[in-house]
Amino acid sequence: MDKFRIQGPTQLIGEVTIAGAKNSALPILFATLLAEEPVNIHNVPKLKDIDTAIQLISQLGAKVKYNKSVYVDASNIAVYCAPYDLVKTMRASIWALGPLVARFGQGQVSLPGGCAIGARPVDLHLDGLAKLGATITLEKGYVKAYIKGRLRGAHIVMDKVSVGATVTVMSAATLAQGITIIDNAALEPEIVDTANFLITLGANIIGAGSNQIIIDGVTSLGGGEYRVLPDRIETGTFLVAAAISRGHIVCHATRPNMLDAVIAKLRETGAKIETGEDWISLNIHGKRPKAITVRTAPYPGFPTDMQAQFSLLNLIAKGTSVITETIFENRFMHIPELMRMGVHAKIENNTIICHGVEKLSGAQVMATDLRASASLVLAGCIAEGVTIVDRIYHIDRGYDCIENKLRNLGANIERIYS
């Protein structure tokens, strides 16, 4: 497996262009299965998960061309089963099920894989499809959905806020007969982006971005062009990189209004942040950041996908702080690895007590999931000596050319190919 070798410490200074959002691009790619005409999707990030999604929809019979944009023609889908060999690496594969059963009356998806960060069951997805009229069964590791005729609109109240399940129900409901109301829907910008894509294809959706989404089903969806919104988590990751390295980074091609909670917390550290319509600048003027309290929450609260990066920030900051994770269990696997580099932390249930240290030491560490791997790479950039980050296939799942972008900011980082 590939590794990163990082020589630190480095003050990261410069400019970076933010890629398209993984958490928009993936549901949008799977939603192309609903379209009877070709679709062009722009600003798609170059990620391992994107490659997997493209392979999957190609195996189902879609014609796909992937260059700077992704062209999908799903007019001749002939296979309705997403196989284990692809699904095992990516939990997002469950998003194929809703479009398949909505358009073709049947679909099968192997129980999905992805990051090992606790219980993220697909029950909410399946409950939503069942309420739309689909018969759901589990056979030999595959989830199967079936219906005679069209799905039927329904009033669905989500038991808990779930981005993934909101996407599944919203996408499937676009082709259902009648009106579907989703209450307690997720509010994330990526939900709005997916809804806007579906609207481009001819769907009738109102309320995306609020806790109630209303979909008036249509008989078919056409084609169109769409541009994926910028990745707010990649943006936040590079802003943290500037803060922990006592540097200055400007992020371009992003949207500051999607990052209010992250920006507010970074300002608490003492960093100076400036924003424009499509850029954010963080300059901490060579100072050590101040420790801050962080509690993850569904959007518009502090994103769980930024928790690992802010854990690192607090562990090198001035003072003692507490980070509370409310979204996922078992999402502190980066902490034992950071301890190998000299941090002082104590895990108590769903909280981390962080005692900031002034310096980190390079070490050999192992990535355990996507966002944890980002925190380890950033730690290597500011640690004294050499850091080796193993199992970086995790970071390739969610960050577009991260080593090139860090290198352009001054990091001494190289990929060691296996």
From Swiss-Prot:
Catalysed reactions listed for this entry: phosphoenolpyruvate + UDP-N-acetyl-alpha-D-glucosamine = UDP-N-acetyl-3-O-(1-carboxyvinyl)-alpha-D-glucosamine + phosphate
Main location: cytoplasm
Chain residues that bind phosphoenolpyruvate: 22-23
Keyword Phosphoprotein listed: no
Positions bound to UDP-N-acetyl-alpha-D-glucosamine: 91, 120-124, 160-163, 305, 327
Uppermost EC category: transferase
Biological processes per GO annotation: cell division; cell wall organization; peptidoglycan biosynthetic process; regulation of cell shape; UDP-N-acetylgalactosamine biosynthetic process
InterPro entries xrefs: Enolpyruvate_Tfrase_dom, Enolpyruvate_Tfrase_sf, MurA_subfamily, RNA3'P_cycl/enolpyr_Trfase_a/b, UDP_GlcNAc_COvinyl_MurA
Key words, A-Z: Cell cycle, Cell division, Cell shape, Cell wall biogenesis/degradation, Cytoplasm, Peptidoglycan synthesis, Pyruvate, Transferase
GO molecular function, one term: UDP-N-acetylglucosamine 1-carboxyvinyltransferase activity
Family: Belongs to the EPSP synthase family. MurA subfamily.
Full protein name: UDP-N-acetylglucosamine 1-carboxyvinyltransferase
Lineage, highest ranks first: Bacteria, Pseudomonadati, Pseudomonadota, Gammaproteobacteria, Candidatus Palibaumannia
